[in-house]
């Protein structure tokens, strides 16, 4: 349970933790709380951004997907300890079989897997069947669900799925779930077959995503209707028992979860992985009973919650990294308290997108391209890393992220340059000049040039806002800010209502092409927030889909990066380090590389938790 306040005695007991921070400021953060049973193993956790809901077909944000990844299960998953990553069966019985041309994929579903109990099942156990996966995939194509990832699903080219969606749109009738399509079929109760219009050599990897592509029971969706985001019913290790929007999320052990044991295949030279396997091998999962998640958007209260042992785990906010993990090592005062730290370069990127449909920064004409390039050249990424991120990032050269195919650490591009003089020359050359002597540039047609930057009301965002003003003032560009909560900004971004916005993205798999989906024309309004449309880029992207990994595909990655650098629909700034701290009573933690689920793989030792 997370307390709303701390007694004087508790504050004194936690002074050892607080000593490594700046000060406690005499108060602890106000957190949500939920009733729990004594002796229950509870993982207490914090999200820095509010969730949006728990219907896999309707979400795209990271934090909602972290929750759904622990409730639903897909056909495949990732080995928790294997590095390089390895896919293994989850609800599938064995690995997928595929045709020689990679167009037909067949999967056996394990018999006897049960959904968690729910009133929708009329008090009877409900076994997962192949049809549940057929239904779940079709839901992404249903226009009524307004799925933010529908373009990505259709990109797999399931035969007949796009036509079924178009039929519903054209006739303005409910989506026809009962019509069988060739692309996604249940051959029998426990066999599902996927048939694709084009080869997809890496299709099997797409089936390893608990957060989005788990089994969904049709009767549950039909029972709850529009309230389905609050009623996730899956087969995973946990079930949702309480949800106060943007405040508290509580999961508990799923009592119908099957007998799953801790198994993994760490590399022989992976000392940490081998130690975890030796400690937990054969333990029944999940090892904990309950997960309590509070939402704390401000970094200082989030950090204090960890120091005061109100939460068990924290991704250290940037402004506290140097106190918590100087030189990448846990600070002595924290280490003395048994706190452990983990640092790793994430398979992610932070970037600013430009709305290509916006009349100020969008467009493909030379002056609009020059404006975006100039803005990118004026962005002092090294200062961002040094001052705001406290050194916890590396400069990015392209959208493709570390640890994925297509990432080349030797690749360099203008995307990684900081050159205000070149930025000013570009602006001067293309007519963005100060016509009235007020110190600010106007557009070539004489209208004011003002960048409207979408941002959030938290402390870290305010630091980025100040850097925006400083960077742009240096080249004579005025900036204003549109402030809103992160979920609101995401909704506006997908609708094409923002001029530009800075956010981040993490890879969900080892194929670097997923990062390039943010530039693929048909993904506009979905992953492609910039609404970038470029025929040659789309051709390259489509070719990458159908060929195996190898030299040809590597060359296509290079060409795609050059196109993005030339047109600058995104300014990719950094790849970030994660710095995680865990209290000594949270045991078995290891940050996943691409996947979201890990709560079932850790244990809580209540004997080491401080008494209240």
Language-model features and meaning:
Residues 46-100, 233:
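N-terminal lobe/hinge region of extracytoplasmic solute-binding protein
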Residues 160-173:
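Surface-exposed intrinsically disordered loops and tails
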Residues 573:
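Active-site-proximal polar cores
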Residues 3-7, 33-37, 80-81, 96, ...:
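Extracytoplasmic/periplasmic ligand-capture domains
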Residues 213-217:
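Aromatic-residue-lined binding/catalytic grooves and analogous aromatic/hydrophobic interfacial grooves
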Residues 1-25, 31, 294:
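N-terminal secretory signal peptides
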Residues 35-48:
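Short N-terminal segments immediately surrounding and downstream of signal-peptide cleavage
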